[in-house]
């Protein structure tokens, strides 16, 4: 039997697998590490231990009958604000290298394996001032392992992968490696604009305006006046060019359109022809459908895997151990 934990800022997801890698059970709780942000290391670590063993106690009790492999942990639990900070592996990264570079910790006679993150620029000169080149991810690589593991043919799994969210990731995966990636803080910017700025202050609740969204996706992708376009959300309401109920769709479209432009440019620079294959989108269903709509508006094809990619990723890693 094996146990794996996907532990992020807002959620805790636990998976139990059989010896042959079949998913037996999944549990989820709103116990993200953000709940203890700002507390002392000792307080946070005690809380992490309590949460882990409370949610997995009955699974661990079975180890007297069925031996339990080390518990795999991925996500922000392995960050500087988590339980054990693990190093970043520099791209390009073969995904099996995650288990090879895991950090081990023993708690209550149970071995925990904290998986590393992935980075761009981690091996650069520490005196380098090229901050815009730096990038990191923790947790998304697990979903990528699941998405690329459906085929043993590395050519079939090669392509561009998008993981939308607070900090969206665009990943160039080919030749069996995570070659490069690009982060766009689209979700965080959208939330900030809507909740904490004058730009979003005139917005109002209402049904999603798909037409406004698609038009602003095109504007965000093609416009050379992106920043002033954001202010258009406020000016447009004042001049009655856009309804207050459509402001969220307008801002979302602008941000996602610009994100797509930057993500596509990342892969074009590396020489990949992204328009020749479907872009794979991994994440929450509603958000994935929004990105599919945006990509379709711009003439790109996309696909959304049906399975739980984190579970598939853990299963693939366990098979390599």
Predicted segments with their positions:
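Short beta-strand-loop/turn "lid" adjacent to the catalytic site in phosphate-handling enzymes
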Residues: 59-103, 108-131
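Glycine-rich phosphate-binding loop plus the immediately following alpha-helix
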Residues: 32-40, 120-219, 223
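Glycine-rich phosphate-binding/hydrolytic loop that grips phosphoryl groups
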Residues: 293, 303-321
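Glycine-rich phosphate-binding loops at beta-strand->alpha-helix junctions
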Residues: 11, 274-294
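Phosphate/pyrophosphate-binding loops at sites that engage ATP/ADP/AMP, CoA/4′-phosphopantetheine
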Residues: 52-70, 260-274
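Short glycine-aspartate micro-motif
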Residues: 2-6, 70-72, 159-163
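Short glycine-rich, Thr/Ser-proximal phosphate-binding strand/loop in the N-terminal lobe
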Residues: 2-4, 8-46
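Adenine-nucleotide phosphate-binding core of ATP-dependent small-molecule kinases
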Residues: 219-262
